[in-house]
UniProtKB/Swiss-Prot annotation:
Protein name per Swiss-Prot or TrEMBL: Kunitz-type serine protease inhibitor IrSPI
The species this protein was found in: Ixodes ricinus (Common tick)
Endpoints of the signal sequence: 1-19
Encoding gene, per UniProt annotation: SPI
Disruption phenotype: RNAi-mediated knockdown results in decreased feeding capacity of the ticks.
Gene3D superfamilies, per database record: Pancreatic trypsin inhibitor Kunitz domain (4.10.410.10)
Lineage of origin: Eukaryota, Metazoa, Ecdysozoa, Arthropoda, Chelicerata
């Protein structure tokens, strides 16, 4: 029973850590894309290195590692900077 509980906790921790991006990935620059004529523009969210938080990016048509459909998704995938739950704000250094 104890071994089963340990295994469940271990796999839960691994799944949680694999479900989000590394801080380096979240701090990737957001690519500037040129949209094709008639392309559907949308608002996406990305982690902004200057403000240390997820922010909206209006008029995007591209995709990238640091682009998310919702702010909640951005915060969940990039829990760094002002979104950190550890009690300290990352200074952005790697």
């Amino acid at each position: 029973m104890k071994a089963t509980l340990v295994a469940i906790c271990f796999f839960a921790a691994v799944s949680y850590s694999m479900g989000r991006l590394t801080e380096t990935q979240c701090r990737f620059p957001v690519p500037v894309t040129s949209c094709a004529e008639g392309a559907k523009l949308r608002t996406v969210y990305s982690f902004n290195n200057n403000t240390n938080q997820c922010e909206p990016l209006k008029g995007s048509c591209g995709e990238g590692v640091n682009q998310f459909e919702t702010e909640d998704c951005c915060r969940r995938e990039c829990p760094y900077g002002k979104h950190s739950k550890v009690g300290k704000v990352s200074d952005g250094t790697f």
